[in-house]
Amino acid sequence: MPEQFLHGVEVVEIDSGPRPIRTVRSSVIGLIGTAPDADEDLFPYHSPILIAGKRSEAAGLGRDGTLPAAIDDIFDQTGAMIVLIRVPDWFGEEEWPSFEEEFEGPWLPNVGQIIGGIDDETGQYLGIQAFLAAENEVHVTPRILIAPEFSHHPAVANELLSVAERLRAVVIAD
């Protein structure tokens, strides 16, 4: 049993690029948000994408939405490993709310997409739940979860905390 316990810091190494990237496993950031101008092939909706320490890997996101600004802010501090999840700008591509629905209650675009869940037809994780698939898809687990400009909503913060508990991660909320 003692040989299974890790005494110290665990390091993850990604060697898919021209040179290996090493980072502490507990410093992988999970970032969820919007990027309406992103390249659909490089950044599909609700899929974990690994950005391994270079701004150039995020070039296909465009300039609009919450993800490009958040990635710029992160890389202004350090070259971090980021597991990125892109969600649609609205409830769905063709599911724009009517004028009456928009003004009946609080105007919260994207909150439902950010919170996510599980697709009934495909079984795919959606929104924040997609962080649970990161280990299988990109071979790293995010340990710091952030949802810039959305985590101040109680429902989003609660979902982040729920997923963080399952991943043994921490949440940084607005």
Ranges and model annotations:
Residues M1-D174:
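Surface-exposed assembly/interface segments
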